């Protein structure tokens, strides 16, 4: 896409496997007020599995069924400046290499998103998301028809 972006311009980037109601206008505004090359939306999410704590003898001392994770995740809605292309080397992983490289130069920001986010990585998630859509109860649908 580099040939389609003007030098000095910013552009939006997202993954194709997540749905969210990220406020794009606020994301762009946050990106523009900082001196970064890229900004991604970050949110808390729930564990896909039950989380346990154990004592030294492996006796379970607590069990939290699919509790909220402590750290935030990149939920995949991003604003990038043209300069991001200076950090991309060939066909390496954008998440594993490019974003880490940008972060190492103190040019990567995270925009706090406290709204809806759901990845669609499994068949079960696809069924649930399609059900929400069919029931006209999709939290990510923030536009009017």
Residue ranges of model-derived segments:
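Active-site nucleotide-sugar/metal-binding loop of Leloir-type enzymes
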Residues: 1-10
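Small/polar loops that bind or transfer phosphate-bearing groups
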Residues: 15-16, 40
């Amino acid at each position: 896409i580099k040939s389609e972006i003007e030098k000095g311009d910013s552009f939006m980037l997202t993954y194709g496997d997540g749905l969210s109601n990220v406020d794009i206008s606020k994301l762009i505004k946050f990106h523009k007020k900082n001196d970064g090359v890229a900004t991604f939306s970050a949110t808390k999410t729930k564990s896909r599995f039950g989380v346990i704590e154990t004592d030294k003898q492996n006796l379970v001392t607590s069990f939290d069924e699919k509790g909220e994770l402590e750290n935030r995740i990149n939920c995949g809605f991003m604003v990038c400046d043209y300069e991001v292309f200076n950090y991309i080397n060939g066909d390496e992983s954008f998440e594993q290499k490019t974003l880490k490289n940008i972060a190492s130069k103190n040019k990567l920001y995270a925009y706090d998103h406290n709204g809806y986010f759901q990845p669609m990585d499994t068949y079960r998630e696809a069924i649930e998301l399609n059900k929400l859509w069919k029931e006209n109860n999709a939290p990510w649908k923030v536009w009017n028809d």
